[in-house]
């Protein structure tokens, strides 16, 4: 099974855009986990393990191994999220 995390941080405008587009898609909660990339102003251990260097970053893991990453919000439209949810929603 693939776990999909959208890494975001507080005050990040591109993150807000990506989250807003994601939340327009029915069933997103069953597919994507919104994950805070920072704790107390520092990258979280999980974010570091996933290679996150900027937000928003999307990371897909299968059996704990990174299988895909995507950084930046420019392509994280509602159509992108809809396709992601449709592809991974019935696994």
Where are these regions (language model features)?
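Nucleotide phosphate-binding site architecture
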Residues: 13, 53, 67
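Structural micro-motif
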Residues: 48-59
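Local sequence-structure signature of Cys/Sec-based thiol-disulfide redox active-site neighborhoods
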Residues: 1-28
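Short alpha-helical
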Residues: 13-14, 41-42, 76
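Non-catalytic, surface beta->alpha helical segment in thiol-disulfide oxidoreductase systems
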Residues: 59-91
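Thiol-based oxidoreductase modules, predominantly thioredoxin-like and allied folds used
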Residues: 5-8, 28-43
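CheY-like receiver
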Residues: 46-49, 84
